[in-house]
Structure formats: C-alpha cells, structure tokens
Design a protein with these regions (language model features):
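Positively charged, small/polar-rich N-terminal and surface patches that mediate targeting and assembly
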Residues: 1-107
Length: 107
C-alpha cells in the first residue's frame, strides 16, 4: 500500500474552504491543500438532484492519517455528510513525498 494519498473534500464557501485548509495544515494532518474555486457539482441528495458551485480541496497527506483527518473534517465541516474521498499516490517526486513525511505526523 502507498504511504501517501490525495484526498478530495468539497466546501460550500471560500471561508469554509480556507478554514478547512488552514486547520488541516496547522494540525499536521496535511502537508498541502490546494483549493479549486467554483467547481460545478451535480449530485443526488435527499431524493432530488442538486447543482451547486463548490470549492474543491485537494489534500496531500499520509495514508496513516486518513482516519484522524476524516474525523477532523466531520467535526469542522458544515455539511451533514461531507465529500471525503482518498486516492493513493502511487508515484511522486521523492523530495515532495519527503516533504509530506517531514510535516505530517506519523502513526
């Protein structure tokens, strides 16, 4: 299994995206969070289709921090069920991956 992962999280406002990004990095749960503004999201929720503008957070971290990160996001997110999806990083620039290891707490 890969030691590192990218996690996608959506937020409904810039303020919330900034709060989550900063909180994850300050808590050493993430090395870097990139924010894409005004993502067009179409999704099914509570028996209907919704279309919203959201902010997409791309989080770079360690696999062993996923559970702690998920808990932190659920406790600090305005959505009842926030999008939190993790994908393994199979390859990457070694110096960048070392940066993740140097910043993010290891279990």
């Amino acid at each position: 299994m890969s030691e590192h992962c990218v996690i996608f999280i959506t937020a409904g406002s810039k303020e919330e995206a900034d709060k989550i990004s900063r909180g994850l990095v300050e808590s050493k749960l993430a090395f870097c969070v990139s924010t894409l503004p005004k993502v067009h999201s179409t999704y099914y929720w509570e028996d209907k289709i919704h279309v919203d503008k959201e902010f997409l957070l791309i989080v770079k971290t360690r696999q062993d921090q996923y559970e702690a990160l998920e808990t932190w996001v659920k406790n600090n997110h305005s959505y009842e069920v926030p999008e939190i999806i993790a994908l393994p990083i199979e390859q990457g620039l070694p110096a960048y991956l070392n940066g993740i290891d140097d910043w993010v707490a290891k279990n």
